[in-house]
Amino acid sequence: MQSLRKSLLQFVFSGASMRRWNDKLRPSELYEVDKQGHKMITAFLLYRLQCRKLGMEEQLKLGREVIEGALFDYFYRLVITDIKPPVFYRIRENEEQYRQLTDWVLGELEPRVRPLHEDFWQRLVAYHSRPVQELTGHPSTADRILRAAHLYASRWEFGLIRPLNHFDEEADEIELSFNRELQSMCSLEGVPELMAGTGNALVRTANLCGQLRFQIRWSQTPRIPETAVLGHMFIVATYAYFLSLSLGTCDARALNNFFCGLFHDLPELLTRDIITPVKRSVATLPDIIHQCEEDEVQRRIFQPLAEGGYADIRDRLRYYLGLDAGSEFKETIRGADGTVQEISGFDELNDNCNANRLDPKDGKLIKVCDVMAAFMEAHSSIHNGISSPQLFEAIARIRGEYGRLVLGNFNVGTLLADFD
């Protein structure tokens, strides 16, 4: 039986404590989960550019390969956390050593991942069992998208720490390596723009999104780890994809749910993370905040994208943010002409609209994943010895509001009870 378990949620969340550039002087801590969020936002932009020349089935296939390839790489990275990239690349050059390391990693991943979905697990095994020559000599389009996105997000981080590490003998070589490898990928549409700097609307969007790693959630509540908005969005996206697999959604719905989770807090780049009690303090405040967010997103992201020749990307982001339905947490489908139609609820979407041609997107499922990620933040901090009344209140509120909720074959309360 397919099931989403506590151990997998915690495993994904553990990237919030995994420091990056740990051997360099850093202006602030940089965490793996934030880098993964930035990487996947960049990968989305590159993916949508490739979709311009693909049919629907090819788009869905490529989208699944991009998302799952990113998750498979992230899982591997979490297991080999202490191996620096140069050392890992040396290991990968020796096929026998790489196979032994991969066999060990798969053994660590199996009890966490396999219960979620057997086919997903088999795809993970196949992904990490590919010959090294295939990865380096004949990469797929998805591989190239993910590699370029990884390089861009890592180079972005390095740009933060470079001025502080003028004494570091490795700094020049690291910078040269990033630029050289990105330059070698310029045949992939979108990469030349990433190399060109912030004058392009595509790069400006990726750059703005990267700044969400500086915005700490629960900013007035001490926590360990102190998750940022960027990492939170990646965690919500990952949970949404897991739930989509567990529910047996169509490919379009699974992809839409991942990307909706990935972008659901994008407007907070422009208005900051406003905590739930404040939002609920005045009856009209949520509407005021929502309108401010929509206006700012239109001015700083959507309008530049449209004017820069990326109206198709703007339209997808509008759909994920639920701007035509009033909220990202509403179930929607899209007609052949692109018209967005709101669906009455989860059951209606799940029973009657689970088809690629309808381009379905969940609402309540995304909200549940958002709440589960917040629950993980509060629960993990308390477990790590940092507690406060606000964290206990958040856990109690989530249990009270979602403890009896059932989405298809997924019982939210049963999963929450595993954390007792």
Language-model segments: which ranges?
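Alpha-helical, largely C-terminal catalytic domains
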Residues: 1-420
